[in-house]
Design a protein with these regions (language model features):
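A conserved beta-turn-beta hairpin within the catalytic core of GNAT-like acetyltransferases
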Residues: 64-73, 82, 128-129
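Helix-loop element at the rim of GNAT/NAT acetyltransferase active sites that forms part
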Residues: 17-31
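A short beta-loop-alpha structural element at the N-terminal edge
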Residues: 2-16
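Active-site rim helix/loop that mediates acceptor-substrate recognition in acyltransferases
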Residues: 27-50
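Conserved beta-strand-loop-alpha-helix junction that forms the acyl-donor binding cleft
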Residues: 108-117, 135-139
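Conserved beta-strand in the GNAT
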Residues: 50, 56-64, 71-76
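Conserved GNAT acetyl-CoA-binding A-motif
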Residues: 98-110
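Conserved acetyl-CoA-binding loop-helix of GNAT-fold acetyltransferases
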Residues: 83-96, 119, 123
Length: 145
């Protein structure tokens, strides 16, 4: 089983970018992997974790906490490491970090077309909630990394 550790090494960067491109196939500029990494590191919250199989990044999870709710983002497991508990370990690790900060509820979003992952999250205690998710891009903050 890969070990879960905070992202802290620029050596991880290229592997995380490749992983996210493989798993998510980014199309929108605001989701550019390098930009996402830079913005998360700038937040300095210590909520960016990688699963390492030796020196190889096998998975990632980013978490966020606003003082009330926590969020999970970019839960990704390389296809060669799936069905081995890596995703579960990453989510549980992020949950523990959020819980230690006083988080009362954790949310996540599933992109349309990836509904199959719903069962995975339900197996971890998450439930589909009747919500409408809305977003607004801030173009001046979307710059290439």
């Amino acid at each position: 089983m890969p070990s879960i550790t905070p992202y802290s090494n620029e050596v991880h960067r290229s592997q995380v970018i490749r992983l996210w491109e493989t798993v998510f196939g980014y199309e929108a500029a605001h989701n550019a992997p390098g930009l996402s990494i830079d913005k998360k590191l700038a937040a300095g919250d210590g909520l960016f974790f990688v699963a390492l199989a030796g020196d190889t990044v096998a998975g990632t999870v980013l978490a966020g906490y606003d003082g009330h709710r926590g969020w999970l983002y970019s839960v990704a497991v390389h296809p060669s490491h799936r069905q081995a508990g890596v995703g579960t370990a990453l989510v549980r690790h992020a949950e523990q970090a959020l819980t230690q900060r006083g988080c009362m509820k954790i949310n996540l979003q599933i992109v349309s077309g990836n509904e199959g992952v719903t069962r995975f999250y339900e197996s971890l205690g998450y439930a589909v909630e009747p919500r409408i998710s809305m977003g607004k891009r801030i173009p001046q903050n979307i710059t290439p990394a």
